[in-house]
Amino acid sequence: MASLSGPISPTNLEMFKPGVEELNPSKLLLLSYHQEGMLYPTILGSLELLSFKKERSLNLQRDKVCLLHQESQLLKLRGTGTDTTDVLLKQPMATSVNCCHDGIFTILEQDRMPKTSMAPILTESSGSLVTRLMSIPRLTFSIGTQVAMRLFRLGFRLARYSLRVTILKAQEGLLLIPDLLHAHPVEPLVQDRVVEPILATEPLPLV
């Protein structure tokens, strides 16, 4: 107690001075951003400072893109005698809609060009092609039938044997048609077509 009642030395006064924390440059920078109304991370570290700078640069880049678009639209209207006061009011609304959160500026989609439909053309071409393909077997079968009749009349054994094998294979194919249609469906025009019997006309001369 006696020591406390005596004179206080300068060293004792320094012990009672409140400690003042020195702010480093990064904290001062964050505080200046806070005064401008910007948000900053709660942890004052180097990683948070880098992420904050990156986010702020993206925001500035997005604003720059939107402002450039607005100025370019006004420059186009300048010198044409158009009143740009109404454009100044409407342009920020369109800019806020077109500016995405990731900084990418999207252009409003213009009226699409009318596309010519190719469906009727393809249908007509496919129909004519199917008709042409259906006429080819009919002509082939008519010629083959006439030749087969002449060969049977002449009595060539080899010709008759080959014709019998061909006819048996054709009959086997006719029996397998329903299964083939389920595995490989074809167009209704070909599937629903009724095979008409071919009448033999005048016999063709054998070469």
From Swiss-Prot:
The keyword rRNA-binding does not apply. It is found in: Virion. Pfam families: Corona_I (PF03187). It comes from the Viruses. CDD domains: embe-CoV_Protein-I_like. Disulfide bonds: none annotated. Keywords: Virion. InterPro entries: Corona_nucI, N2-like_embe-CoV. GO terms for cellular component: virion component. Belongs to the coronavirus I protein family. Structural protein that is not essential for the viral replication either in tissue culture or in its natural host. The gene encoding this protein is included within the N gene (alternative ORF). This is Protein I.
